[in-house]
Amino acid sequence: MEIAVLDIKGKETGRKAKLSDSVFAIEPNDHAVYLDVKQYLANQRQGTHKAKERAEIKGSTRKIKKQKGTGTARAGSIKSPIFKGGGRVFGPRPRNYGFKLNKNLKRLARKSALSIKANDKAIMVIEDFSFDTPKTKNFTEVLKALGIESKKSLIVLGDSNKNVYLSSRNLKTSEVISSSELSTYKILNAKSIVFLEGSLEGIESKLS
């Protein structure tokens, strides 16, 4: 698969970037995509929730009233879950929601997501660029030239480019990442994906 390489003004450079069919044109595996996205979202959960059970509540353990003869239900400690301020029954405890997936499945999921976006014509390739100083205005002009300033976009860099990254941090609709940070969730969450020309080789070698 070949795609025209654009410059930062949105015009064709006359060059074509070759996208590997083994990465950008496979039959998507929906279940692999589902598992990888599920793992990504699970890993975002902090899992710090905690409720005190009756043994952890501060208070007296004396019996509230005598066992028999009151005509009402028997009752023990004030920390019982049936009373206001009592402990929680089977309350949430801190836990790690993350789970593991093997590398081959994660690789398949990423290739499936890229193939979906390629099939939807949602992928662009532009020549490598950088800024002398971080400036949001410069980055916004690039997005406007590409026609994606109002779309949720993902820009994938080949090498770490600090000024480009800093120029994008103030924008809600775009995210700049390095090729090593590319994930199935981020691919699917973006309406448009822009690859810098230098990022393709690293992505294809990692996923092939």
Swiss-Prot record:
One of its GO terms (cellular component) is ribonucleoprotein complex. Pfam families: Ribosomal_L4. It comes from Christiangramia forsetii (strain DSM 17595 / CGMCC 1.15422 / KT0803). Keywords: Ribonucleoprotein, Ribosomal protein, RNA-binding, rRNA-binding. One of its GO terms (molecular function) is rRNA binding. The gene is rplD. NCBIfam families: rplD_bact (TIGR03953). This is Large ribosomal subunit protein uL4. Belongs to the universal ribosomal protein uL4 family. Residues 45-77 are annotated as: Disordered. Part of the 50S ribosomal subunit. Transmembrane segments: none annotated. InterPro entries: Ribosomal_uL4, Ribosomal_uL4-like, Ribosomal_uL4_dom_sf. GO terms for biological process: translation. One of the primary rRNA binding proteins, this protein initially binds near the 5'-end of the 23S rRNA. It is important during the early stages of 50S assembly. It makes multiple contacts with different domains of the 23S rRNA in the assembled 50S subunit and ribosome. Forms part of the polypeptide exit tunnel. The lineage of its organism: Bacteria, Pseudomonadati, Bacteroidota, Flavobacteriia, Flavobacteriales.
